[in-house]
């Protein structure tokens, strides 16, 4: 695995828009404020031509223009790290115009984004053996003040941090809108982790069935392996395409084992279950050590009696590995910045989780 150099003091932050740009509110104002904040921290900025573009369908510009920008700015020596302007809908089409051979031959560079940016963070790992950060997009850094998760992501980029923890509360409903573009996360809900582990011979009950451990004092759990994953909506879309080298990646790193992280955006509970089934049957979960599952955007919803827990656990039970759910990953902020492709140790103590990156 190739790990990029950290963002140096007085370095240059590059911004690209392979998915949505920051063309409309509240993202436009938030992105402008993010630039002010990074400039105040001493950094120079290198904005790609699509950062404010609104010419595409589901992305900032045409797939050709987006792919060209992403390749050029990743391989450029004019910036030290890249942050994606935002998520979106059709970044998969951008991938057809990204030169992965050129990226693989270039000096590795930290790329950060989430949601639709799974198309890049996942493929950087599986195609290029290059680590990236599944974390906040550029406009989020415009909030006043920064949430702790934004500081974590920034310090991870700078090399000032090699571990992340869960946060006390999460945002069920955002207050940010066109008239209030710089509001911080509206964290109102206490984080309550759900911990499912295979039953052993000494715990009673049917051996091998998943049981839920209380996220309370006295409960401890540790996992170690290589992180891989992203937004399920995007992951299952890549499955079976020419970009799908996931099974080969898992085989290449089988001695480490894979810790999958997953979260869902548009998918309802049935959609999540179908996607998990497809990934499982495609062999993606070979050499798996465990699963880190973020709160789905459709949190708390049921679909014909199926909830978010059974949508995942029923199908993954036979893999006989721990499944940690309702984590700070994904679309219901805040989110722990995760190093895609990174080797990590996950430690759970009660309702607390810590991820230590062991190779940074």
Kindly label every feature range from the protein language model.
Residues 98-124, 131-139, 319-322:
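Short, acidic/small-residue loops that bind anionic groups at enzyme active sites
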Residues 226-265, 269:
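Oxyanion-binding "anion nests"
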Residues 15, 82, 116, 235, ...:
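Buried hydrophobic positions in well-ordered alpha/beta secondary-structure cores of metabolic enzymes
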Residues 133-233:
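Conserved anion/nucleotide-ligand pocket segment
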Residues 1-78:
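ATP/NTP phosphate-donor binding region
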Residues 75-98:
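Long, hydrophobic/aromatic-enriched structural stretches that serve as scaffold segments
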Residues 81-83, 112, 259-261, 292:
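Structural motif
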Residues 269-360:
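C-terminal active-site/capping subdomain that shapes the small-molecule cofactor and substrate pocket
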